[in-house]
Amino acid sequence: MIDEVLLDAEEKMEKAVTVARDDFATIRTGRANPGMFQRVVIDYYGTPTPITQVAGINVPEARMVVIKPYESNQLKAIEDAIRNSDLGLNPSNDGSIIRVAIPQLTEERRRELVKQAKGKGEDAKVTLRNIRRKANDELNRIKKDGEAGEDEVGRAEKDLDKTTAQYVSQIDELVKHKEGELLEV
């Protein structure tokens, strides 16, 4: 029972770190990266669909992204979705592909993005702490119901704290890495 609680908590924490990693990939760094388009969505035959699923995205140069839709009738929708997204990019449509030049980030914009990255990191840490709290509540319930002894539950709580600290440090590493990427000129 205790092992199940710990395993469940660890799986949820792993998922939270994966979500945070995906969130960080969407923050623009001034370098071309196909991951920055993961959250850009178009209306594809009535269904909201990420453009990464309706087009091939290539990075021929460090500051250029080329998007080639699988269906040419989606060109305008993809172009509009990129233009209207919060990425601050201006795509150009040449009739068969969309080119997106990635402009150099200003110092002020870099600072904003660092702040945004730290906020996402903090949100991920809150998620990890909530997972730990729920697991601790479950462990206390097990102890209260007499399904496990106090020593076993105490050891499990220490293991849970160690696991939480490990995942929090992974989030800190992700934030530090993203901050370094953003501030690199």
Curated annotation (Swiss-Prot):
Its main location: cytoplasm. It is found in: Cytoplasm. GO terms for cellular component: cytoplasm. It holds the Pfam family RRF. GO terms for molecular function: ribosomal large subunit binding. Keywords: Cytoplasm, Protein biosynthesis. Belongs to the RRF family. This is Ribosome-recycling factor. The lineage of its organism: Bacteria, Bacillati, Actinomycetota, Actinomycetes, Mycobacteriales.
